[in-house]
Amino acid sequence: MDKQVRNTTEIVRLAKQKSKKTREKVDKAISKFSIEGKVINFNSIAKEANVSKSWLYKEHDIRQRIESLRERQITANVVSKPKKSSRSEEILIKTLKRRVMELEKENKKLQNQIQKLYGDLYNKE
């Protein structure tokens, strides 16, 4: 059994080193996306950093960072509509009233045509 002494300290050191490198890749990807203005979400960061999405979700600090950046991007993209001035509202109302009057005239014209056709049909019988 003495020959099979386990070197767990080396395994732990290598695991920490791997985790550190992975974090650096993720930080690089997040920084790159922030600078370039690209969409930051779990899929895009996982793809860019070549890590799994489950790893990103598992690391709470990275998860919170991605979620906060994602929320910040969403709120930045929401643009409020400019309020209409009273003048533009008046113009819109006038335009709509004119359109309604045109449609009413057309409707009346079509109703008269229908009555005439009914009259012609009745006279043929």
Curated annotation (Swiss-Prot):
Q: What is one GO biological process annotated to this record?
A: transposition
Q: Which domain of life is it from?
A: Bacteria
Q: Does the keyword DNA-binding apply?
A: yes
One short Pfam name that applies is: DUF6262
Which molecular-function annotation in GO is an example for this chain?
Answer: DNA binding
> What biological function has been recorded for the protein in this entry?
One of three proteins encoded by transposon Tn554 required for its transposition.
Q: Could you tell me what this protein is called?
A: Transposase for transposon Tn554
Origin species: Staphylococcus aureus (strain Mu50 / ATCC 700699)
